[in-house]
Amino acid sequence: MGTRPSASGPLAPPWPALIVSCGRRSIGTALAIKRRSAGRTSIVHIQNPRMDLRPFDLVAAPEHDGITGENVAITTGSLHGVTRAKLDDAAAHWQSRPSHLPTPRIAVLIGGSNSAYRLDAATGTRIAQELASLAHSTGAGLMVTTSRRTDPTAVAAIRAALEDAPAEIWSGDGENPYFAYLGLADRIIVTGDSVNMVSEAAATGRFRSFICPLLAAPRNLNAFTAPWKTPGPRANLRARWLTGNLTP
């Protein structure tokens, strides 16, 4: 469930049997519907609502948020839509695009700055230079995708630093090959600013993923990535924390 100002209006029956809400903006509407339905509407909320958990029938929250309760279902990482079928379909659709790249092929998922991380032009240059060095030293090809959050100056810096590298770079023009890159990759490198991207990379299951750290990790993302910094029960997620350069 989401909310849109253009769709605002009075709440009226018939009331749904179930509401699945996500994010804090949807909570007020979901709880209002539950009250008006005299409790006949159940609410499943995705993510930590950051309020009293008792009004919800179920809260699905990632382990690194650190919340507990009888109505809390703990997830490892974030919920996402990555499935083997989706990856295989996307890979089949896009398989000719990176066909000129050498193998092994590395998918590189680039996020962007947020309230806790900085991914500016200088950071983009550093990451891309390390990627170019990795590609040249291992003979690998790079399938690079940026996101809507990637600053244009960082995109330009990444393109410039990878100009002579065996790389295919998508930066917002045309159809997004994100899931195809995940499906076609032999390895995955993802910037550590987004729990969603890291979770999606880890969920591919077949290949080892590497998290490229950025500056100023907040507490909850530190908690999210901490189990992957050393061997342990997260090994089945096939992700590892890169503590230094992107060396083979």
Summary of predicted features, one role per range:
Residues 1-74, 80:
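Active-site and donor-binding regions of nucleotide-sugar-utilizing enzymes
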Residues 47-51, 64-66, 78-80, 169-175, ...:
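Short, acidic/turn-prone active-site loops that include or flank metal/cofactor-
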Residues 52-53, 116-117, 150-155, 217-220:
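Short, charged/polar "capping" segments at the starts of alpha-helices
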Residues 53-120, 243-247:
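A nucleotide-sugar donor-handling region in carbohydrate enzymes
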Residues 104, 113-145, 151:
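Conserved catalytic-core segment of nucleotide-activated headgroup transferases in glycan assembly
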Residues 140-174:
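Catalytic donor nucleotide-activated moiety binding site of glycosyltransferases and closely related
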Residues 178-221:
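A donor-sugar binding/catalytic signature common to diverse glycosyltransferases
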Residues 226-248:
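Leloir-type glycosyltransferase catalytic cores
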